[in-house]
Amino acid sequence: MKILITGSAGMIGSYVVKELIAKGHTIVGLDRRESDWKHENFIQVALDLADKKALNDVFENENVDRCIHLAALAHFAGENDLSFERFKFVNVTCAENVFEACALHSVPVLFISTVDAIGMVKGVITPETELNPISNYGKSKAMAEGRLKEICQKWNIYRFSPVYTKTQKRDIEKRYYLKYPNWAYKIGSGEKFEVLEIGGAVKSMVDWVDKEVDNSIHIIKDAELLDVNTLIQREKAEGRAKHVLWLPRWMVVCGYYCIRAVFGKSNKTYLVFKALWPFRTIEG
């Protein structure tokens, strides 16, 4: 197959490109910058997804079979503008351009969303759980999910748990570090979190290429929970986490409700909410 991947030069995208090429597929990679990695079956196109004409030209010229839409504004490193308008432009408006091109050319699309689109929800979560996003990232991804359903005839949505590699843990470290690499923390007896190792994320997308596109939503996560106690012990063994602050759960819960009384449902309260009531998801 010839598969179009947006965000092909990003952390996740670069892994997916290599794995799909190893499976014998041809990849059309769209990104604002070209990857340093080259292959005869890797067609790189440097463009901005806001450029509708350039985007549609790629679809016209390359005759792709499927699309994986990975490109997004997610993590904050190096970003100066974190307004909702910026998130909406990148994650909704640019996504709409991709979805419209897919619909025009009858290309099935896999949209990579996030569990942050679910938001502040307690209890067991399924793909059918009503969304209550709080963060700008989660709100924009939830909006994009809605637009995908309206625009495209054939689609799937994969809501990824936080993705990590051995060397890049991104926002996972927030769950056990106050200040990396020396000051760790744990709440109560230590929480367990749903996360997603890069290999599992890549496998889910590679497998999708050979599956029937059935307009369904799936939550993608590791089979095992991330145990904060085990993780801190591992960090200490490697010379990090020299100090571990233990926070009684009751104290953090009280703090959460005090913060919420002042700020309501906001990014500040959402971060504490996720630490106290980690997601527990099932396929439904």
Q: Which stretches of residues belong to each language-model region?
A:
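NAD(P)-dependent short-chain dehydrogenase/reductase
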Residues: K154-G200, D207
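Mid/C-terminal beta-alpha module of Rossmann-like enzyme folds, strongest
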Residues: S204-S266
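Conserved Rossmann-fold NAD(P)-dependent oxidoreductase catalytic core, especially the SDR/UDP-sugar
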Residues: E96-N136
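Rossmann-fold cofactor-recognition segment
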Residues: E40-D51
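N-terminal Rossmann NAD(P)H-binding glycine-rich loop of SDR-like oxidoreductase domains
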Residues: I3-K23
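Glycine-rich NAD(P)-binding loop of the Rossmann-fold in SDR/ketoreductase-type enzymes
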Residues: A50, R66, R86-N97, S135, ...
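Active-site Tyr-X1-5-Lys
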Residues: M120, N132-N156
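NAD(P)H-binding glycine-rich loop region in Rossmannoid oxidoreductase-like domains
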Residues: L49-V90, A101-L104
